[in-house]
From Swiss-Prot:
ATP binds at residues 43-50. This is Methionine import ATP-binding protein MetN. Transmembrane segments: none annotated. Belongs to the ABC transporter superfamily. Methionine importer (TC 3.A.1.24) family. The gene is metN. PROSITE patterns: ABC_TRANSPORTER_1, ABC_TRANSPORTER_2, METN. One of its GO terms (cellular component) is plasma membrane. GO terms for molecular function: ABC-type D-methionine transporter activity; ATP binding; ATP hydrolysis activity. CDD domains: ABC_MetN_methionine_transporter. The keyword Cell membrane applies. Keywords: Amino-acid transport, ATP-binding, Cell membrane, Membrane, Nucleotide-binding, Translocase, Transport. The keyword Chloroplast does not apply.
Amino acid sequence: MSKEPIIKLDNIDVTFHQKKREINAVKDVTIHINQGDIYGIVGYSGAGKSTLVRVINLLQEPSAGKITIDDQVIYDNKVTLTSTQLREQRREIGMIFQHFNLMSQLTAEQNVAFALKHSGLSKEAKAAKVAKLLELVGLSDRAQNYPSQLSGGQKQRVAIARALANDPKILISDESTSALDPKTTKQILALLQDLNKKLGLTIVLITHEMQIVKDIANRVAVMQNGKLIEEGSVLDIFSHPRESLTQDFIKIATGIDEAMLKIEQQEVVKNLPVGSKLVQLKYAGHSTDEPLLNQIYKEFEVTANILYGNIEILDGIPVGEMVVILSGDEEKLRQACQAITDSQVQLTLLKEGGKA
């Protein structure tokens, strides 16, 4: 994957004026997105994420900042392109939305073809391209169907095909799976991941669900109240979230909070004996391959009772989390915990035996 940024947003501000009020929707945000990334931008409603991505193709003009797309500066405290150049630039960027925005009176085939209206292609070339795009999104057999005859997932596939009609280098997905059921969401995410690999497509994914980012993105930015509060690789953010909002998103995505509620109700945890510790272990990469709990038993005679375990694959790297009760001699227990930490496993003490 190339390390060259295809999208550079530098010190972006977006300010709206409403009834003598000034609303700072985006505040001094800098984000660089590399060619071929699937880049997730996460935040709750009102965080500014959708406003931010709309500046990428200048559907929303910033109040200040600099925008560079594929090495071309398109905004530097003012629009630097002519209207013709801007139209050409926008052809490089496709968009899909939560609501599919298909024309109800047109078939799937005609909806995709509509995006080629000003392409300059012959009628035959357009037909061939539309057929290829529908095949790419797995809808060849639905070409003649109208939107009312399609499921939500199929409508989104038509919208994706239409967004790809002008061979964009960038695809912006703004909450594109929010209206879909979980199974269909996974199918659409798998399609986006496939398009990223097949076409080298850079995808900017706007969502309020960290689960979606976890499933397909390789980098993530977290926004709150118009500000960028955390940014990095998905692996780093999931392994070492700094901000409380990010931690909350990750807890929801991994299900650890729900698991902890059940763990805390177990008698063995309620009545944790002296000489035992309830700990949470987080580990990534090579450390998931080490039989660590077996080693600490052999070396320190410390036993481990596993109450919860989960392994995810994030950007191709295994990341795990466990909640265990470690039991043994006090000094041996201290040494075992140190050995775990020395093995690049993050250890958090949740409860100590004999204490409330």
